[in-house]
Structures are given as structure tokens and as C-alpha cells.
């Protein structure tokens, strides 16, 4: 059985595989949002070797937490109308090698990711206010 099957993951529109693991029971309407959101949500997110997370952004802060396998390059691309690469982080198991065990993607920031080894990478992502696909934007193809 593959890791995707064991973790009961499904394909994510940005690339990779995910499953929502928690949604806060408290809802509210944050300033600037088009409707009610959960206070926070959490997913497991797997990027197997050879796959990538395309440039995208969400309206809320997103905290990446390394869970297993190999390190991932997390690219931050600013908050402009299109991603502008320039700030790469590594989320992974080895702080001595400069890896971050946790990394914050600020609300509205473009982000993309890719595994740095053939092991792929597994992270948890916590979004607050909680994730809603209405708050998700993929960059135009080619970005």
C-alpha cells in the first residue's frame, strides 16, 4: 500500500496530495473575508519525488510543519499580482543544515514547493483563519 493510500490523501489542485485532518469547531467572519471561516484548519500535505506545488496563495496565514521523509524547498514570492521568486526556505529534519522545522507563509503571499530528495516530503499545514477554496488562487500557467 502506498503512502498516499495509507494516509487517505487526495490530489490537490496545486500539485501534491492532501487530506484535511482538523477543522476548528469555532466559526467567525474575519475582516476582509467574503464569509464565515473556521478559526483554523490543518492538513497533511505530501509532495512525492518528481512532483511540485505550483505557485499559489491563500488569504490566510499558513504554517508549514515538517512531518517526515525528506526536506522541501518552500519558495515565497511576495504579495504582488504575480509571484516574484526571491525567498527560498527549506522545511526539513535538520536544523544544523539550515532546515526549518516550521515556516510561516504570511497571508496573501505567493508560495510554491518542491522536494529536495528522492524521498519526497511530508508536512502539516495549519491555516488561520481556516482554509476555504474560495480563498485559494493558483498563479497563471507558466508561473
Language model regions located:
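Non-catalytic, conserved peripheral segments adjacent to functional cores
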Residues: 1-103, 110-113, 118-120, 125-133, ...
Amino acid at each position: 500500500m502506498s503512502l498516499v493510500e495509507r494516509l487517505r490523501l487526495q490530489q490537490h489542485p496545486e500539485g501534491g496530495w492532501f487530506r484535511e485532518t482538523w477543522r476548528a469547531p469555532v466559526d467567525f467572519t474575519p475582516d476582509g473575508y467574503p464569509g464565515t471561516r473556521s478559526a483554523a484548519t490543518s492538513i497533511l500535505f505530501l509532495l512525492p519525488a518528481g512532483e511540485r506545488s505550483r505557485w499559489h496563495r491563500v488569504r490566510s496565514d499558513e504554517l508549514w510543519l515538517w512531518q517526515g521523509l525528506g526536506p522541501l524547498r518552500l519558495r515565497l514570492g511576495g504579495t504582488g499580482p504575480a509571484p516574484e521568486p526571491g525567498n527560498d526556505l527549506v522545511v526539513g529534519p535538520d536544523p544544523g543544515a539550515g532546515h526549518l522545522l516550521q515556516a510561516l507563509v504570511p497571508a496573501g503571499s505567493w508560495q510554491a514547493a518542491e522536494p529536495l530528495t528522492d524521498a519526497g516530503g511530508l508536512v502539516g499545514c495549519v491555516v488561520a483563519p481556516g482554509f476555504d477554496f474560495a480563498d485559494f488562487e493558483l498563479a497563471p500557467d507558466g508561473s
